A protein has these predicted regions:
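Hydrophobic/aromatic-enriched cytosolic interaction surfaces used to assemble or bind macromolecules
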Residues: 1-240
Length: 240
């Protein structure tokens, strides 16, 4: 565990995908006692696929249940609302009740966040200084998150299930067309495993001019990578 300000400790653990997510989490806490230490701040960062963004203006108490039913195609047990004040929006994502309750009992000060939140805030900050629209695509496993900003305004965000390059090409070009982006002046940044990103860039260059590749490791803002004394960040991942 880091004891010096600015130090960073990271541990990756392989898990048995045949076991339930809750049992896997219990095993991790039993095998790694530092997870249960008292911390000044605890962040649980999830990449839960069930998410959406709603404007702050319509996220009111009397409308929440209706929003949840409309947002999630299948019922979710717990809905977490993460404010994104810079975007004047709220990021909603669903969680399993058993995992949520286990974390609440084990780490009562834990704060849930979605991996997409940090990305959106970083892209929003960039777009405030940009003259043209910019689309971002992040490919991990069999999903692709796509977002587009135009001078500080979020134009689009969604997650797609993808199996191959053809799927990625289809969704990227479809969204590009629907948003009426300019193939000469507007930009696309791809983040994926290097071989995927550069192969996809080569194919897309037939249609778009400004295509960039950014390593996934550099996506997250500095405050997501920097560890401070008394802080714990846990990032569960889902294998598909």
């Amino acid at each position: 565990i880091p004891s010096d300000e600015g130090s960073f400790f990271c541990e990756e653990t392989e898990v048995d995908v045949t076991r339930s997510p809750l049992q896997t989490l219990r095993d991790l806490f039993r095998e790694h006692p530092f997870l249960s230490y008292p911390y000044a701040a605890v962040r649980i960062i999830t990449s839960e696929p069930n998410y959406t963004i709603v404007p702050e203006a319509i996220y009111e108490d009397e409308a929440k249940e209706r929003l949840y039913r409309f947002t999630f195609a299948t019922p979710v047990e717990i809905v977490v609302a993460q404010p994104l004040r810079e975007l004047e929006s709220v990021l909603l994502f669903g969680l399993r009740r058993d995992m949520h309750d286990f974390i609440a009992q084990t780490l009562p000060t834990a704060h849930w966040e979605h991996t997409l939140a940090s990305l959106l805030l970083g892209w929003h900050e960039r777009s405030l200084r940009a003259l043209h629209a910019h689309m971002y695509a992040v490919v991990q496993d069999r999903t692709m998150d796509v977002a587009c900003f135009d001078r500080g305004t979020l134009q689009f965000v969604n997650r797609f299930e993808v199996e191959n390059h053809d799927d990625m090409m289809y969704y990227l070009l479809y969204v590009w067309k629907q948003l009426e982006l300019d193939q000469r002046n507007d930009a696309l940044t791809l983040s994926a495993v290097a071989s995927v990103a550069f192969d996809l860039k080569e194919q897309l260059q037939t249609y778009l001019q400004d295509i960039r590749v950014e390593a996934i490791q550099t996506l997250y803002r500095a405050d997501d990578r920097a560890a401070t004394v008394g802080r714990l960040t846990v990032t569960p991942t889902t294998n598909t």
